[in-house]
Amino acid sequence: MQFVNFFPLLALVVISLAGKATVEAATGLNPPVKLVWHYYKLTNTCDDAETYIRYQVEKFYKNDSSIAPKLLRLLYSDCMVNGCDGSILLQGPNSERTAPQNRGLGGFVIIDKIKQVLESRCPGVVSCADILNLATRDAVHMAGAPSYPVFTGRRDGGTLNADAVDLPSPSISVDESLAYFKSKGLDVLDMTTLLGAHSMGKTHCSYVVDRLYNFKNTGKPDPTMNTTLVSQLRYLCPPRTQKGQTDPLVYLNPDSGSSNRFTSSYYSRVLSHNAVLRVDQELLNNDDSKEITQEFASGFEDFRKSFALAMSRMGSINVLTGTAGEIRRDCRVTNANDGA
């Protein structure tokens, strides 16, 4: 696959997306139902919903810029498991957020706050699934990403099923990663682009220690990791944590660090073998993802445009519309269990 002549077309694709009123939404992104741009304004049900959401995100972001990577991970964890139906927001003993892969998820507080505000203004109208998509868009835009169009009209799912969480380990190979993304209707460009979200945020040392001390049971670090990075991470991540000790956190992109800025430095780090997670470094082991990585490392605007398209595609996976699902009154519980 050749991408050399593809990237100049991304701007046209994003512009055409912004100019359309609807987008197909489901597995493979080709279903019989549709999402609508500015759904709540178009249907005259909550004209200022997106304005309310943006205002709350701005308030939170000014106090804590880490909400950008937190919301990105939260949205990914929602959309990639049974689609973008807000089910990751549900609480309960068997909810998706209790799955091991979702340990350390954040961003719930801001979603709950936004929902409270919208319920006071437009009760029973704006779905939690749409709130999560719109809030994520606004937060990452504040961090430096493009403000891509978010098509709305999603409804909320009501299934609590931790066993359904099939999010892969961050230590998988590029072939395994690509197979997972393809199973969700996404492609190698989407995968390489969405992994660029690791340009900000943190990860637990437990996801990195195998690369630092005993890669593939060799008793040695991952030979693809820059030796300086190995030393830096070993200082922060012990080979094992004792009972009762917390699992330390390290930055996914030390170049961004606490600023949580959306940049293309992630791709430069991959090329120089300074990726923290194996799944990121593995991008060089596939011809297509390597070519895309090289392009994004040298062309930030190409990355920004591709990110806008990939987020729109991910946000359209297996959505509920029409009479399917419900509009939750409280994002943490289904209406049947709300007690209101």
Curated annotation (Swiss-Prot):
Protein name: Probable peroxidase 61
Residues the record lists as binding Ca(2+) 1: 78, 81, 83, 85, 87
Gene source species: Arabidopsis thaliana
Glycosylation sites: 63, 226
Family assignment from sequence similarity: Belongs to the peroxidase family. Classical plant (class III) peroxidase subfamily.
Cystine pairs: 46-122, 79-84, 128-331, 205-237
Function description: Removal of H(2)O(2), oxidation of toxic reductants, biosynthesis and degradation of lignin, suberization, auxin catabolism, response to environmental stresses such as wounding, pathogen attack and oxidative stress. The enzyme activity has to be proved.
Active site residues of this protein: 73
